[in-house]
C-alpha cells in the first residue's frame, strides 16, 4: 500500500494484465470517485497533465490509473524550473479544463459559493480554534467571517468559467521526465483562479519566501493572460490576499481535525508553520488588518502557541 497523508482512499501499486505498472485506487465514497473519474477522463482527453485511467469497476468504487512514479514536487521545492512549470500548467487546467465541463458531477458541491466558504470557515472555528482553548468572541468572529464571505462572493457578479482545483499543493504534483502531472483533484469545482494560487504558494511546509511567491505569481499570470486576454491583473491581485486568508483558515481547520482529533503527526507538525503564515499574511497586508481586525488579533494570540 502506498503512503497517504489526509486521504481515506487506499492506493496500491500493481502490474496489470498488460504488464504495465498501475496504481489501483479503492475509494470510500462513490460520488467522490465518480467526480475524479469524470475529471480525469475530461482532462486527459484535452491533453492536460493528469494520469490516464485504465479501468473502472462497475460500481465505480475502484479504478486503476497510470503510474506516474514516486517523485513529488514537494521533494524538489528548490527547483525553480519545476515550480514555474507547475504554475503555468495550473493555468491551463483551470481555463482549458473548464471547457465543456459538466459541473454537476463535482463533489461535494458544483461551485465555490457562499455555503462552501462558510463550511471552510466553520472548519477553522470548530476543528482548530476551539481546540486551542483560546478565548474568543463568536459574534465578532462571525462578523468578520461575513465580511470575508462578502468580499469573496461579490468581487465578480458572475462566477468565472474556470476550474478550481481545491487542493493544489506540491504533494499533489507528480514529476516525471521533468514535467508536472496533477493528481487528487476530485474536490475540484467551478470557481476563481486565485484560490489555487493561494493554496500552492502559501502551503505551510513549502515555506516559500515572499520574493519567490511573487516570481511564481508573475509566471502564472503571464501564462493566464495568454488564456484569458481580458484578465484584469490589478483586480486579480487585489483579491488574492483574501483568498490566501480563506485558504489558510481552511488549512488550519484541516490540520486541527487531522492532527488534534486523528493524531496524525504530519498535520500536527504543520500547525506552527500555518500559524506563522497567517500572522505573516496580516503583517504584510495593512488592508487585511483594517478589514479583519478581530482575525488579526486572533492571529497574534495564536502565534503565542508556536
Residue ranges with predicted function:
Residues 230-238:
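Histidine/acidic-rich helix-loop-helix segments that form or flank divalent-metal centers
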Residues 122-131, 194-230, 242-262, 274-281:
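Active-site activation/catalytic loop segments of kinase-like enzymes and analogous catalytic loops
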Residues 36, 79, 83-86, 117, ...:
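Hydrophobic packing residues in well-ordered alpha-helices of helical domains and bundles
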Residues 10-15, 149-197, 207-208:
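Active-site acidic catalytic loop and adjacent metal/ATP-binding pocket
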Residues 3, 12-119, 123, 130, ...:
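ATP-binding pocket architecture of kinase catalytic cores
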Amino acid at each position: 500500500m502506498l503512503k497517504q497523508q489526509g486521504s481515506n482512499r487506499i492506493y496500491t501499486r500493481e502490474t496489470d494484465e498488460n504488464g504495465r505498472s498501475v496504481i489501483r485506487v479503492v475509494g470510500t465514497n462513490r460520488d467522490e470517485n465518480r467526480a475524479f473519474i469524470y475529471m480525469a477522463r475530461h482532462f486527459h482527453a484535452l491533453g492536460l497533465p493528469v494520469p490516464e485511467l485504465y479501468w473502472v469497476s462497475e460500481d465505480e468504487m475502484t479504478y486503476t490509473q497510470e503510474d506516474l512514479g514516486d517523485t513529488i514536487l514537494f521533494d524538489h521545492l528548490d527547483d525553480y524550473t519545476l515550480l514555474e512549470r507547475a504554475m503555468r500548467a495550473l493555468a491551463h487546467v483551470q481555463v482549458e479544463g473548464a471547457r465543456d465541463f459538466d459541473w454537476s458531477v463535482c463533489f461535494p458541491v458544483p461551485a465555490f459559493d457562499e455555503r462552501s466558504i462558510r463550511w471552510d470557515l466553520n472548519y477553522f472555528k470548530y476543528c482548530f480554534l476551539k481546540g486551542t482553548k483560546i478565548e474568543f468572541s463568536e459574534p465578532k468572529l462571525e462578523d468578520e467571517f461575513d465580511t470575508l464571505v462578502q468580499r469573496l462572493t461579490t468581487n465578480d457578479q458572475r462566477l468565472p468559467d474556470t476550474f478550481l482545483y481545491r487542493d493544489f499543493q506540491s504533494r499533489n504534483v507528480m514529476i516525471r521526465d521533468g514535467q508536472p502531472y496533477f493528481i487528487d483533484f476530485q474536490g475540484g469545482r467551478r470557481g476563481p483562479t486565485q484560490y489555487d494560487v493561494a493554496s500552492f504558494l502559501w502551503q505551510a511546509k513549502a515555506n516559500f519566501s515572499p520574493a519567490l511567491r511573487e516570481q511564481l505569481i508573475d509566471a502564472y499570470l503571464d501564462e493566464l493572460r495568454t488564456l484569458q486576454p481580458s484578465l484584469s491583473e490589478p483586480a486579480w491581485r487585489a483579491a488574492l490576499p483574501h483568498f490566501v486568508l480563506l485558504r489558510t483558515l481552511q488549512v488550519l481547520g484541516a490540520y486541527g481535525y487531522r492532527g488534534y482529533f486523528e493524531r496524525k503527526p504530519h498535520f500536527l507538525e504543520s500547525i506552527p508553520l500555518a500559524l506563522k503564515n497567517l500572522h505573516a499574511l496580516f503583517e504584510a497586508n495593512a488592508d487585511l488588518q483594517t478589514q479583519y481586525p478581530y482575525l488579526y488579533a486572533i492571529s497574534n494570540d495564536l502565534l503565542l502557541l508556536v
